Amino acid sequence: MTNTLRLRSLFIMGVSTAAIAAATPALAQQATMLEELVVTAERRDQSLQDVPVAVTAYTSERRDLLGIATVEDLARNSPSVAYTNNDRLSIRGFGRLTNAIGTDPSVALYSDGIFSNSMADSSTPSLFIERTEILRGPQGTLYGRNSVGGALNIIGKRPAYEFEGEVRATVGNYGTWQSDLLVSGPITEGLRFLVGGSVQRRDEGFIDNIGPAGDTSAVKRYMFEAQIEADLGENIVARLRYTKFDWDDSYGVGNVHEAVITPYDTTSITGLGNSALYYNPTSGFAGVNPSIADPFKINTNQTNEGKLSDHQRLHFDLTWDLGGATLKYLFGRQQYVYNTNGDEDRSVRTGNFNIAAATPFGAYTATNISPNQRFFYEEDQTWYSNEINLSSNSDGPLQWITGIYQYNQQYSQPQGLRVLGDPAMQNPLNLATGTPAPLNPDGNYLFVDGSLNVDSYAVFGQIDYDLNEQWSVTAGLRWSKDEKTGTDFARYVSRTNTTTTVLALGGIPAAVGQGLAVDFTTFVVCGGPTIATCHANPLYRNLRAVSTGGLERDLSAEYDAFTGTLGVQWSPDVDTNAYLRYSRGYKSGGWLASNGLTPFPYADAEYVDNYEVGLKKTWGGAFQLNTALFYADYQGFQAPLTVVLNQTTGSTGTQFLNLEALNWGLEVEGQWAPLPGVQLFGSYAYINAEITEGCCYVDTNDPRALQAGARPVGAPLPNGSRNQSLVGSRLPMTPEHKVNLGGNYTIDFTPGSLTLGATYTYTGDMQTGVFGSPRYTSPSNENVDLRALWKDAEDRFTIIGYVKNATDEVAYQSSTPSAVTGLGTFRQTVKLNFPRTVGVEFQYRF
């Protein structure tokens, strides 16, 4: 993206908003005052301008005005927030780099104050949402779970005291349609209900498959919610909330629109990407990858799938007004099973084929090779939590909250790579004996799994004291304890020229070995044919053989920490709020299970010392400017790194690094109502986030450190690879610059009002991994959204027309390379942003 294009876009937005402002006096009648927004960022109702933390908030109405429907939309419109469509949110450079079992999120999501382990809740239709709040910086002295980066609070609508309802319908391009319904009101005196549902469809995928399989990113989703709320006497209110989600999509977790934008590797005999456990399915293939010319085109013979089933959420909250204090109990339970799978070879090639190859034992022909490779991934999670907190509810100078918290999570995560239609893979041999090994009916050449049980406990509290009318102080403290137990499993079945080579060492002729598959698990992990080889290595003495094939080990760890916050706030007048705050954040350590039995799976805990100074200022009720300057010392940053498990097979696994980093930056948010009917808004974020300690590691995708951006250190290793330094690399998911500009213009008519709006966003380039190579870089991108809303005078009807990504810019959320292929290039996998979408939404309230 060139500077010229960025400047041109900024100029166009500036001219457009100026033109709107100039035309306003003759057309709009409403007052030039900004609406006050009340938030619960500190667990009590406060004006957004009075809260001494950096917060961005959206009401349900503002989400409709800006077109914020997904977590991607939230991230794009909010400063210092980034999202990659792997269900990972990052704030100020603090984000989760892997979904591997045994790891925790860096940003906590709360739905009505109850923690959720998935970002899927953030895509709940706005009809069911009262308000969405994004808190930046460590949180912990007010909330149940820890978060080093920040928190995403979603406050849902509660049952109404008077009967009301709303129905919505949306139609758009790509065969999009959506229907939402919500009804709420009293049942009897002191008893209220809410019930509603949503059906969302996108019959045509964003990514056009010119092959025989279906398009990618088609959507079929359902949601149902029911609540009942009761007054238990004059001072107690209890509510039960149940929600069910169901997805049947043609793409993976977190809205993954994925494409490989490099040529097929037609020359390598084995391997796919950086795997070398099976023959390369595109070896000798004559086809051309259409994604090179157009990343929204693929040519595959297998349809991607993403299914969310049995996703149920149960919440219960009880609030008891004790007079000078409020006692609250929160219980939450959530479960889901998520499955995704798709075409791993990314080609349309069908039918088994032969590969002619040379080995140290002469030429041979690998026969009956299946090109149908699939990836598969599953999450099976259940978690529940209990929280009791007691807080002040008076208007005195002292405000306080204290609470206790318990959390349990149970999780399994089977995943891997398989080949379809290969009898040899389904019936492997034992490496040590040559006799049949346990069956491999799914044809998995890589199968890893893990189980996890987490028990967490916390005690927290915070006080805010007004020294006088202008000055107040804040102090908070938290103690956390996390106990984790689990298992880690892997099985490797190989049918490659490596298989033939190793079998030949045992006297098996190449002509025989080329048609066999072998359970190579002990060889890949431990370097020998039997479990005894593993037990001879202290790092693998806890491994055990599994009767169904493969190896397994137990993992366990405990972590605890004290964290807290200190702050001072100065409010010389009702329109000024200046604050200085220190917060210490903690994220428990863990491990990388379901990642290949790496020898060092554990990671230490993360800590963040965050220093922040902020100013929130309002002028005349028509102009607001909120700024925050932060400096964060990031200790123990958990970074996953792919390592080679076995030099002979080339198999890899992932282990954790604990690195040091430094994040500092500036955030500015502003709103201005210069004339009746006109509102201009914008935000800017600058983040300098770099690794300060981290050496020395081999990039398995550039083992000799020859690619651009490599930082080799020391002499080459015996196998020819080179270590690299990570110092100076930017933290992943952290654009240095991010700009959001927009404006709304409302014209009042006798029958209603018409609002025209536009939003422009510039997001700087981002790194996907911890190495500094440009191959891990997602280029900067720009996005323009346009909307028009008509609302009748009685506020019963609303019609919204929208265009998202109006310029149809192709942008990536992440970019990941493979090792160098036989073509001398690498396989580049990108995750795409949404293309241009157009639609109309109808709303009716009764």
Question: Where are the model-predicted features located?
Answer:
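Membrane-embedded beta-barrel scaffold of Gram-negative outer-membrane proteins
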Residues: 317-322, 326-332, 337-342, 571-587, ...
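Outer-membrane beta-barrel domain signature, strongest for Gram-negative TonB-dependent receptors
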Residues: 213, 219-401, 407-409, 624-626
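C-terminal beta-signal and adjacent terminal beta-strands/loops
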Residues: 677, 761-769, 790-846
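Outer-membrane beta-barrel translocator/receptor signature
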Residues: 105-106, 118, 127-136, 141-224, ...
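Structural signature of Gram-negative outer-membrane beta-barrels, strongest in the C-terminal barrel
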Residues: 229-231, 390-393, 405-407, 450-633, ...
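Gram-negative outer-membrane beta-barrel transporters
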Residues: 470-473, 631-633, 656-770, 841-845
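Solvent-exposed loop segments that connect transmembrane elements
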Residues: 206-215, 252-300, 344-374, 416-449, ...
